[in-house]
Amino acid sequence: MAKHLYKTPIPSTRKGTIDRQVKSNPRNNLIHGRHRCGKGRNSRGIITARHRGGGHKRLYRKIDFRRNQKDISGRIVTIEYDPNRNAYICLIHYGDGEKGYILHPRGAIIGDTIVSGTKVPISMGNALPLTDMPLGTAIHNIEITRGRGGQLARAAGAVAKLIAKEGKSATLRLPSGEVRLVSQNCLATVGQVGNVGVNQKSLGRAGSKCWLGKRPVVRGVVMNPVDHPHGGGEGKAPIGRKKPTTPWGYPALGRRTRKRKKYSDSFILRRRK
C-alpha cells in the first residue's frame, strides 16, 4: 500500500504518514466488543507489563484463520484497517452468500478471487494443505495443528518458505529464521502478508502512539538506583555494569527465555536467529 505524507504546517502532523487506500468501516455481524483486561496490570492493579495503557476503544474483527469455506470461490470486496493487528484485513464475499475476513495478502487488490481447499491453484491468497504445494512456495497463516487455524506467520509482512518434505512432515523456514517441522496435512495460505512497510510508518507525534495503547519508554540510565540497576551516578554516568540488565537485574541481551524441555523441541530443527 502507498503511504502518503501529511502536507501541513502543523508541527504535530508534519512528519506523519497515512494510507488513504484502506477503509475502516467493518460489518456489524463480523465484529464484537472485547474487554481489554487491565492494559498491562494484574488483578491487583500492579503493573506486570510495562509501557502499556490507555488507547482508543477497539472492536474485535472476527478473522477466518481456518478458511472454513472449502472449495467455494470468494471475491475481495474491501481492504480494511484492523486496530488489533499491524496487518490489513480483507472482506470476502463467497459464492454461497457467506461473508468473512481474512488477512490481506501482499499484492491482492479489490476484485481478486480466492479459494481454499485441496487441489486448488497455487496463487496468491489461496489456502491449501502443505502436501499440495511445491517446494519453495512462499506462505503465511500456517497451521501447527490441523483444524485449529493459522498460528504462524500472521504479522504484517511475514512470510515463511516451504523448503522440504519427508514422510508426513514438511520443513518450513519461518520469518524468525527458525526451521521447524509441521504436518503436511496442515493448511497454509499462499503469499506474503500485506502492509510490508508498517515499520517505516511515521506516527508524527507522541499522541498517536498513545492512541495505540503504548505508553512512554524511559531509559534506565536516567532513573534512580531504587528504580533500575542502571540508575544513579553524577551527571551523565555509565551503567556501572559489565553488561546491560533488565529492571529486575537479569541479563538484557542474549538471554534465552524459551521454556526448557518443551514438548515442541523435537519439531525445531534450528533455533531462530
UniProtKB/Swiss-Prot annotation:
Primary subcellular site in the record, as a coarse category: plastid
Segments for region (Disordered): 1-20, 225-273
GO molecular function (one): transferase activity
Biological process (GO), any one: mitochondrial translation
Tagged with keyword Metal-binding: no
The entry's keywords: Chloroplast, Plastid, Ribonucleoprotein, Ribosomal protein
UniProt entry tagged with the keyword Zinc: no
SUBUNIT field: Part of the 50S ribosomal subunit.
Record's protein name: Large ribosomal subunit protein uL2cz/uL2cy
Source organism of this protein record: Oryza sativa subsp. japonica
